[in-house]
């Protein structure tokens, strides 16, 4: 136990030396705020002199957002659209979305206090971007019928059906008539989804969830959203649903 504490302390000292000038510190409190691996990515990016989102794409090999956004998000946006993104991480997708709504608003929602603080700092020069802390199963807004589009990538792939149901009910409340919800899940009836199930390994088995298209359709339809189409990107099946 003592050796584990010593290792942890050494890691914290090194990380804090890099993160403190940026307004962050790596402590047990930070780790309890569910930032996943992002503090480490930020530290490594800072040491490399890179933007953290560029680091995630260029060094970690994460999928580039633009081709997917071009297909399933940008066609539904106007310059003055009001958009909500759930689970934005460090803003890899968000930084492209905000450029498409110069006269609109982008609301970023995350359940991690660390992520929310980071996003507020990262987008501090973008006055039309606001980061909000959520409870991880609903939108932190009381307003009705005010969003043009709700978007999420790589978040709902980890959510249980009950939580997805709660979110979709919130989508119906918050979206304007004619607004869209675009989220991804893992569909085990697709070749890509099934292969992910077979190859994810023991460590990731507790992380991802798998839902059939019939179940996802029913969740959206019961909430008053009509599924218009799907789009496959790797393991993810994006569903595009309209609030009539």
Placement of each model-derived feature along the sequence:
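A short SAM/SAH-binding and catalytic strip from SAM-dependent methyltransferases
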Residues: 149-162
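A short acidic, Gly/Pro-enriched loop at the edge of an enzyme's catalytic core
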Residues: 141-150
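Class I (Rossmann-like) S-adenosyl-L-methionine-dependent methyltransferase catalytic domain
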Residues: 2-80, 86-141, 159-166, 170, ...
């Amino acid at each position: 136990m003592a050796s584990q504490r010593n290792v942890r302390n050494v890691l914290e000292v090194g990380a804090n030396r890099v993160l403190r000038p940026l307004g962050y510190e790596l402590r047990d409190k930070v780790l309890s705020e569910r930032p996943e691996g992002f503090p480490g990515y930020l530290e490594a990016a800072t040491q490399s002199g890179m933007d953290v989102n560029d680091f995630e794409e260029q060094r970690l090999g994460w999928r580039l957002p633009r081709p997917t956004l071009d297909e399933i998000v940008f066609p539904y946006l106007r310059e003055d659209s009001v958009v909500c993104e759930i689970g934005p991480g460090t803003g890899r997708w968000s930084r492209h979305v905000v450029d498409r709504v110069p006269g609109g608003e982008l609301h970023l929602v995350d359940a991690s206090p660390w992520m929310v603080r980071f996003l507020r700092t990262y987008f501090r020069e973008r006055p039309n971007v606001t980061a909000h802390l959520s409870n991880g199963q609903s939108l932190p807004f009381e307003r009705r019928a005010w969003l043009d589009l709700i978007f999420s990538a790589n978040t709902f792939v980890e959510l249980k059906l009950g939580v997805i149901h709660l979110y979709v009910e919130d989508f119906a409340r918050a979206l304007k008539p004619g607004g869209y919800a675009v989220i991804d899940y893992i569909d085990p009836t697709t070749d890509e989804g099934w292969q992910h199930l077979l190859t994810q390994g023991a460590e990731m088995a507790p992380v991802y969830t798998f839902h059939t298209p019939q179940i996802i359709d029913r969740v959206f339809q019961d909430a008053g959203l009509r599924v218009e189409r799907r789009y496959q990107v790797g393991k993810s099946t994006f569903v595009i649903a309209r609030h009539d």
